[in-house]
């Protein structure tokens, strides 16, 4: 930086790398496009799988956009931002992670010629936001309502989601599992919190072995625990269940406790006191005549002995999340102290308590429950990799089912909605004046990336198919014409039963266009060395390559 012809003043550290203006914007566009090209081949039913080596040396085989991108380590900040998009999409609606990355990359590419021609990013961003508003209006206009009480209609929508996955061969099975699980959770009746409740109360348990057809949704829960004593009952019909969040052990001192014993009877007295205390705790439980006691904390040998004498089965150190699910299926209330237990806290809704040995581990099943509001989804499969991919596919399917129940509207898949919105934007672009018209029209062309990618992954002639598709959408009455993902043929998506939830589609458009706008507004990228703490005694600190890291000044508490 020069000032008045004098010596340059260095404001930034010499190690700092800085890109600004057009150079930074073009670098962001290139990084975004590079990330989107990674997942392009994983879109649609004819998608390819990616094999990734994770940092621990394990292998991940998947075509799930979010699962691929979270395993990839990138340096460019714009690329990191793109990867974050897939995570947000997965968190919000569970599906459409690949589509959102492809579309965001295409939106960035569409802006490149305008940046090169020195059109100000604010003009591009304004046009993009206007195109987003028009797109949302058109999508909502094209949406078709669905009857959520009709399982056939919901299954058709779910099969479109699972049809693009590795487990598409077992599509019917996985859609049935997802639908049954969501209907079980919905008995709680809170649609607004359905997303949170599915994560909390629908637990996927993976057990290697068996075949995929052995997978099932339990009308209850299962967890990986055994009873604490081999003589306790492993099979109980209609058990009375008590759930605790406290240890059944003699209370230990808060800090270091010293006990001074003056005579030989003191030891006996101390042990006697412990036995009486535990007997009192157990009696508080036993007066409610339970069959099963489950606690999140420990159970001492003495407490086990007292409970075993009354034929009570005990399970200890259960996870908090598992205990919450057991509470929902058994009707029991989790109690913090044994003396506070009341008759209304005892669970009576569970029909069968059973501990089974599967492989070399014991699993506890609490099934045949009356109107359970939580469930366990048991997945069986040949190997760990297959089970992990099944779980990812089931997660997407559960999310799509949740979206359908929350917002029961569908839009056509197979790129039909993109082509129809593209055609609509193209028509109204002529009414936009000034420079805004060019980026607005660019959004229309960028939307064609989805049908183009579908055609490309099918191995058909992309140019011919997209030209034909564009011509059909410019005519009236062809709103639902798209590309059939398996054959690459141009088909009516309504007849082919390829549907997507409107919530997923709206989220894809909003996330892709808004993130592209955010990245286009960046005109300066500064990257430098981070602050490092100096080792005690003033010795210099070295990084992983043995290079000395310069000392940093200021108090460590400065943040």
Curated annotation (Swiss-Prot):
Annotated disulfide bonds: 369-375
Segments traversing the membrane: none
Predominant localisation class: cytoplasm
Gene3D superfamilies: GroEL, GroEL-like equatorial domain, TCP-1-like chaperonin intermediate domain
Coiled coil: none
UniProt-annotated location(s): Cytoplasm
InterPro entries recorded: Chap_CCT_gamma, Chaperone_TCP-1, Chaperonin_TCP-1_CS, Cpn60/GroEL/TCP-1, GroEL-like_apical_dom_sf, GROEL-like_equatorial_sf, TCP-1-like_intermed_sf, TCP-1_chaperonin
Keyword DNA damage: no
Gene Ontology MF: a single term: ATP-dependent protein folding chaperone
Residue ranges, annotated region (Disordered): 537-559
SUPFAM superfamilies: GroEL apical domain-like, GroEL equatorial domain-like, GroEL-intermediate domain like
Keywords: ATP-binding, Chaperone, Cytoplasm, Disulfide bond, Nucleotide-binding
Gene Ontology CC annotation, any one: chaperonin-containing T-complex
Subunit field text: Heterooligomeric complex of about 850 to 900 kDa that forms two stacked rings, 12 to 16 nm in diameter.
Protein role: Molecular chaperone; assists the folding of proteins upon ATP hydrolysis. Known to play a role, in vitro, in the folding of actin and tubulin.
Protein family membership: Belongs to the TCP-1 chaperonin family.
The protein's name in its UniProt record: T-complex protein 1 subunit gamma
Organism of provenance: Tetrahymena pyriformis
